[in-house]
């Protein structure tokens, strides 16, 4: 509200989060959509795009290059978005949240069984999940990341104190 009162535009960077929270936009999940003036999306859309309110609409020709897409990428992105919109991916009971609950549940189950006490604080939001390995130190995080990579799983580090392992889950996962 302060930014609105001061005429400061609010920019939502949804490059990573677009469609990954159970809503199309993370700002919808956070309940702050009314304050967003500019929003960038990519990845799931198969294209980088900048969305904006009428007030911040740029003059023709101002956006180009990086923000442009090829016809095949735009077509693929549209199909993906249509599928997510019409095939039950979005919403609190949608496939995105089901994948989240299943994956976090599996991490917690690992912590209770074969990896007893080695994985802590599994959680996150939608298709973005993180877990704290071992004691949460940088050294343990690095060792686990290298071991996961060596075994064919690409994961990323995040956080500090504790250091965590993050997963960007694909929306096509199933229990099978």
Language model segments and positions:
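Conserved N-terminal phosphate-binding loop of PLP-dependent enzymes in the Aspartate aminotransferase
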Residues: 1-176
